Amino acid sequence: MKLVLGISGASGIPLALRFLEKLPKEIEVFVVASKNAHVVALEESNINLKNAMKDLRPSGTFFNEQDIHASIASGSYGIHKMAIIPASMDMVAKIAHGFGGDLISRSASVMLKEKRPLLIAPREMPLSAIMLENLLKLSHSNAIIAPPMMTYYTQSKTLEAMQDFLVGKWFDSLGIENDLYPRWGMN
């Protein structure tokens, strides 16, 4: 299976890194981080995103967001699934309105036109009517809108356990088997 992970410049970069860390090793992963993602990772978490991604997934393929001619920009390359974690509202707007000027939005556009799973984890609060309309437009185009929302039924005691719940739910939405969080009613 081939999966693209897009990391845009919204708050919550550690969630993308946790997703990358927990992704089953047999999945071939292609990662595109926006320029702003690198800035936000450093400012918010003191993380060198380029190094962190390569440390977590040495076998991954990493692209520059401006590499619009990369293999993953074409539907014929055969990417099976894509996740954008976190998804900035700027990125959401670009995808919702068909602007594919960078590799993340172009790859997402390909997923929509090819009717392949595209998970978008919007990271903003509160949401304006325009933001909600853009998310609705993407949902109508069969994108999976899955914001990083906390849960309490799992009784998570650590930040890592909360992150694993989110990553597990995202994996579920993409059809990736996992045991990252306790299932409701299964003790």
UniProtKB/Swiss-Prot annotation:
Which residues does the record give as dimethylallyl phosphate binding sites? Y153, K169
- InterPro entries assigned: Flavin_trans-like, Flavoprotein, UbiX-like
Q: Which UniProt keywords apply?
A: Flavoprotein, FMN, Prenyltransferase, Transferase
Instruction: Name the domain of life.
Output: Bacteria
Stored Gene3D superfamilies: Flavin prenyltransferase-like (3.40.50.1950)
Catalyses: dimethylallyl phosphate + FMNH2 = prenylated FMNH2 + phosphate
Protein's UniProt keywords contain Flavoprotein: yes
Q: Which family does it belong to?
A: Belongs to the UbiX/PAD1 family.
Role according to the record: Flavin prenyltransferase that catalyzes the synthesis of the prenylated FMN cofactor (prenyl-FMN) for 4-hydroxy-3-polyprenylbenzoic acid decarboxylase UbiD. The prenyltransferase is metal-independent and links a dimethylallyl moiety from dimethylallyl monophosphate (DMAP) to the flavin N5 and C6 atoms of FMN.
Q: What is this protein called?
A: Flavin prenyltransferase UbiX
Query: Which organism is this protein's natural source?
Result: Helicobacter pylori (strain ATCC 700392 / 26695) (Campylobacter pylori)
The gene it comes from is ubiX
